Amino acid sequence: MQKLAEAIAAAVSAGQDKDWGKMGTSIVGIVENGITVLGKIFGF
């Protein structure tokens, strides 16, 4: 869950800095960590 929060914070920070490459990478991290969290919740 902490990694998901860190990825969201990184995406927000990148958006504020207009660093689009880092923002794209952070969004991928959000999706990846979100899937991991859902997998743990549903037992995948």
UniProtKB/Swiss-Prot annotation:
GO annotations of cellular component type: extracellular region
GO MF assignments: toxin activity
Q: Which Pfam families match?
A: PSMbeta
Q: Could you tell me the superkingdom of the organism this chain comes from?
A: Bacteria
Query: GO biological process: any one?
Result: defense response to bacterium
Q: Does the keyword Transferase apply?
A: no
| Residue positions, PTM N-formylmethionine | 1
Keywords (alphabetical) are: Antibiotic, Antimicrobial, Cytolysis, Formylation, Hemolysis, Secreted, Toxin, Virulence
Q: Where in the cell is it found?
A: Secreted
Q: List the disulfide bonds.
A: none
Q: Which family does it belong to?
A: Belongs to the staphylococcal hemolytic protein family.
What's the stated role of this polypeptide? Has hemolytic activity and also inhibits the growth of gonococci.
| Protein name (database record) | Antibacterial protein 1
Source organism? Staphylococcus haemolyticus
